[in-house]
Amino acid sequence: MDLTSKNYLKWVANKRCIYHGTAETVVPHHIRSLRLGAGMGIKAPDINTIPVCHECHTNCHNGTIDLETQLMWCLQTINNALAEGEIQYG
């Protein structure tokens, strides 16, 4: 998968919130971290995206939901994408 993928972002946006399980107002949240190849002025790769509701999106940005939790959710999202054939390994 390329670093940017509109199809993957659309797929993420159509999922339920990874934490609350709600389907209303789900937005793709890019996990931004210098360790993950993103930071100030640098967009995170789309593979580092998780489906979250507005509340969780706010909490990801304000630090209430820590980076470790976001990364765990990212792995779950990638596993789901692999299982559904949205992305392929290799």
For each of these PLM feature ranges, what is it?
Residues 1-9, 37-44:
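Short, intrinsically disordered, charge-biased short linear motifs at domain edges
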